[in-house]
Amino acid sequence: IGGIGGWILRIPSRFMSPAATTGVLTILPDPPPPPTPIGLIAGGGQLPVIIARSLKQAGHVIHCLGLSGQWEPELPGLCDTFREVGVLKIGSWGKLLSKIGVQHAIMVGKVDKAKLMYDPLRLVRNLPDMAAVAAWYRHLRNDRRSHALLSAIAEELDRSGVALIDSTAPIDDELATPGVMTEHQPSAAQIADYEFAWPMLMQVMRLDIGQAVAVRERDIIAVEAVEGTDRMIQRAGQLCKAKGWTLCKGARPGHDRRSDVPTIGVRTIENLHAAGAGCLALAAGDCIMIEKRRVLDAADRLGISIVGIPTAFS
């Protein structure tokens, strides 16, 4: 990993408070020591797979609940037990885990929130149980943002004696670090762009609108909302035909590490390249880089610089 020592000096001093490198996510206790059983509530993508491998290597017993239509095929083989559960059957999640002696769980992976919340046939495709209906009226009827959804799920699991824990603890070596992480260096224009855009991203995240903005020549091209980062990248590329724009991605101040931690992977880099981006600025300590070495290699190969920005500032 090249350039961190020299290029970290290019990060503005306002980004470098004493607590800067600790990130802004809510810090939760680490998983209990092995062989304590851990529940894994898994959506889609490779993150649940990587966490399962890490937990298994650490010596934990893994009891996995795969969300219907979301989980990856290789996941059952990495877990001691596996069961598919309905996406909106949240009342059953805690009961199933508690029944087999699980008191701690990690919830990770992708779920298409747009389809889940706004599909006209959502109640037919994903029939909710009574716990989900109750959670809707307590938490989500007036606020459907990610933190409200997490609170509803955590509360329901807690009723069954299952506590959600820090989803990044098993993979802390996969988090973004301060400074330039790639051999490929950002241009002066790209540095100016992420310095310009970062305070705006912080405001977007405080409102829990999204976790990313796209910027070029000190002008915001796109803001992420419910569509997710991949679709937002595609939209930014369509709006900005000029090459070399920058994507800034971070975590909401006070964000809860129990779920929805900002995540990028090799596909993110490939999507950025296809859309004409030239730089990716990530919140250091707050963004997961799935298979980090592969991500950095892909970025260098495709000419995209990746910079970690400490985020403990307002």
Mark where each language-model region is.
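N-terminal positively charged helical leader segments and presequences
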Residues: 11, 48-74, 79-81, 132-136, ...
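Solvent-exposed alpha-helices and their adjacent loops that cap or buttress functional pockets
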Residues: 28-34, 56, 75, 98-100, ...
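Conserved mixed alpha/beta catalytic, RNA-binding, or beta-rich assembly cores of soluble enzyme
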Residues: 55, 143, 167-269
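Feature captures the catalytic cores and cofactor-binding loops of soluble hydro-lyases/lyases
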Residues: 68-92, 98-102, 124-128, 132, ...
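Structural motif
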Residues: 37-39, 60-65, 103-106, 154, ...
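N-terminal glycine-rich phosphate/adenylate-binding segment common to multiple enzyme folds
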Residues: 90-170
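N-terminal basic/disordered segments at the start of proteins
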Residues: 26-67, 88
